[in-house]
Regions:
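Beta-strand-turn-beta hairpins that frame and shape the catalytic cleft
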Residues: 1-4, 114-124, 172-177, 205
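Acidic, His/Gly-rich catalytic cores of divalent-metal-dependent hydrolytic chemistry
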Residues: 170-249
Length: 249
């Protein structure tokens, strides 16, 4: 049994296509698990949804930005300029997916996915952390105690998350926690896409985090070509201008 676990595609089919090509180059998989943040803060949400739903076998759960697009909720941030940029971007995406006939599909995405691996191990896939699609997520600043609290009583041996755009492979007690990073909208300094491959059989399983390069200048050009309302806000990711809070001086 082979799985590819992706998250945070953010309306970027160029990055998604690069990851799908890498999966094929690794011999393909039996199923894709996609952990949300599919459409917002990107230039072509419809193509991303078409690509993903055309895969032979694929499961989805929602991310916080998928929920924002559908419900009108917004992130709890204090930077007023970022608030305005995000509001404009989410509104544009909402109109785009509504016109394309995907609004109801997006709104029906579940909070989590579960799978049983061949050796009996229990897999849980969520966007941010068990029980939530939002918040700080699984990030390098979490203490061992905080990490253990996240996985207490979750009925899983292997947990996959995204949300923070920062790949991590951690263990809390007997639970393996893998943050697959993001397909798009990367934090500096490593601007490549990331995802995870799972190899599972009757005797156990292994997880491999992979990095994939793609044409970021083509993404920048596509953002301009899409007449997105906040091009500068999006382009910053692909020029390496964004760093997470734990990397800022």
């Amino acid at each position: 049994m082979r799985l590819a676990v992706l998250s945070d595609i953010h309306g970027n089919p160029i990055a998604l296509d690069a990851v799908l090509a890498d999966v094929a180059g690794q011999g393909g998989v039996d199923e894709y698990l996609v952990l949300g943040d599919l459409v917002a803060l990107g230039y072509d949400p419809i193509t991303v949804l078409q690509r993903l739903t055309s895969l032979p076998k694929v499961g989805f759960n929602r991310g916080n930005t998928d929920r924002y697009v559908v419900t009108g909720d917004r992130p709890a941030i204090t930077d007023q300029e970022a608030v305005i940029e995000m509001a404009n971007s989410f509104s544009w995406t909402q109109g785009y997916v509504t016109a394309g006939g995907w609004f109801d599909w997006l709104g029906a995405l579940p909070l989590e996915q579960r799978r049983a691996l061949p050796d009996g191990s229990r897999l849980l896939a969520v966007h941010a952390a068990p029980g939530t699609d939002d918040g700080p997520g699984v990030n390098p600043e979490l203490s061992d105690t905080e990490l253990l609290q996240l996985v207490t009583d979750i009925d899983a041996d292997l947990v996959f998350v995204g949300h923070t755009h920062w790949p991590l492979d951690l263990t809390a007690g007997r639970v393996r926690i893998v943050n697959v990073g993001s397909v798009s909208n990367p934090w500096a300094p490593d601007l490549r896409a990331s995802y995870a491959l799972v190899e599972a059989g009757p005797s156990g399983w292994s997880v491999h985090l992979r990095r994939v390069d793609y044409d970021r200048q083509a993404v920048i050009n596509a953002i301009h070509g899409a007449h997105h309302p906040t091009p500068g806000f999006l382009i910053g990711w692909f020029r390496g201008e964004r760093r997470p809070s734990w990397q800022r001086g």
